[in-house]
Amino acid sequence: MHNSAPITRRKSKRIYVGKVLVGDGAPIAVQSMTNTCTTDVAATVQQIQALERVGVDIVRVSVPTMDAAEAFKLIKQQVAVPLVADIHFDYRIALKVAEYGVDCLRINPGNIGNEGRIRSVVDCARDNNIPIRIGVNAGSLERDLQEKYGEPTPEALLESAMRHVDILDRLNFDTFKVSVKASDVFLAVQSYRLLASRIDQPLHLGITEAGGARSGAVKSAIGLGLLLSEGIGDTLRISLAADPVEEVKVGFDILKSLRIRARGINFIACPTCSRQEFDVIGTVNALEQRLEDIVTPMDVSIIGCVVNGPGEALVSTLGVTGGHNKSGYYEDGVRQRERFDNELMIDQLEARIRAKAAMLDENNRITVNLIEK
């Protein structure tokens, strides 16, 4: 029920990664990457399918060898989400996965060989309508740039990116997006700002090697949040040393927090104090787990007392305000006569949320059993 944030998106060219539109004002796509051994086809497919269930738009798969390329063929046949092949050094791998239907090539043109090899990959991408992602990383800058700048700097990352962009420009290929990632938040942010001012290609955002589930999510939220709030970014990946499923969840949470793209429930909950009339933390944790399948956007406020509860409920799709034994219930900002038994709060609220989702989105039209007071 809150109004969308007044963020003006940077104008960028339109490309397609599979059927996913990227750039030109399209919804910001959430990407992740498998961390299985690609030659373990069953494990990789299983992980991609888990990512699909939580809403991933694009999945990147490392393809370091020709054996991995053969495995990629089998993986591609078993999943629906667009796949990006991450390739370095050996141009023949890029040609092989193109033959197998890859949706995007993540390469740096400058590190896959001489001009002839680069041209063969670009021509193959052009002939098969395959976009390319140029991926610059502060940890793997060219040696001459390290010597020139002394250390990774925004200017160094920009120069590296523009080298690869210039190669594609010379080959008259413009179906590409670019990333300039760093593990340092401010280095990454400034690098993206510089790049955004130089080219109009779509930009893929990420704070690389951000860390574990908690610290990595924090770094990514700060860095990507700054860029997204400035209208910069067309796809994103949250790089975590954790289950890739968590990357997708954090990515959508960042987009939801900025009200850029909504998917699923945005829970608004108090941190609790001695005024709480029911177990807020337990209720929120339980509902987050139970309702992961709901993709319909809605705000649900769960507040333990009447200090802030009514105000939050007024601007939420559904809201609960803690009361003695029974708690007040709101729909679309209107207080209902119905009150929830605090002991049955989780089941009652889950039922109401599912009923609301069914009303808002026909894809959720399922039988909903309401819990009696």
From Swiss-Prot:
Cofactor binding annotation: Binds 1 [4Fe-4S] cluster.
Matching Gene3D superfamilies: Dihydropteroate synthase-like (3.20.20.20), Sulfite Reductase Hemoprotein, domain 1 (3.30.413.10)
Record field: catalytic activity: (2E)-4-hydroxy-3-methylbut-2-enyl diphosphate + oxidized [flavodoxin] + H2O + 2 H(+) = 2-C-methyl-D-erythritol 2,4-cyclic diphosphate + reduced [flavodoxin]
GO molecular function: 4 iron, 4 sulfur cluster binding; 4-hydroxy-3-methylbut-2-en-1-yl diphosphate synthase activity (ferredoxin); 4-hydroxy-3-methylbut-2-enyl-diphosphate synthase activity (flavodoxin); iron ion binding
InterPro entries: Dihydropteroate_synth-like_sf, Enolase-like_C_sf, IspG_bac, IspG_bac-typ, NO2/SO3_Rdtase_4Fe4S_sf
Gene Ontology terms: biological process: isopentenyl diphosphate biosynthetic process, methylerythritol 4-phosphate pathway; terpenoid biosynthetic process
Enzyme Commission numbers on file: 1.17.7.3
Cofactor(s) essential for the protein: [4Fe-4S] cluster
Pfam family, one: GcpE
Annotated pathway: Isoprenoid biosynthesis; isopentenyl diphosphate biosynthesis via DXP pathway; isopentenyl diphosphate from 1-deoxy-D-xylulose 5-phosphate: step 5/6
Enzyme class: oxidoreductase
Keywords for this protein: 4Fe-4S, Iron, Iron-sulfur, Isoprene biosynthesis, Metal-binding, Oxidoreductase
Superkingdom of origin: Bacteria
Family: Belongs to the IspG family.
Function summary: Converts 2C-methyl-D-erythritol 2,4-cyclodiphosphate (ME-2,4cPP) into 1-hydroxy-2-methyl-2-(E)-butenyl 4-diphosphate.
Name by which UniProt lists this protein: 4-hydroxy-3-methylbut-2-en-1-yl diphosphate synthase (flavodoxin)
Gene symbol of the encoding locus: ispG
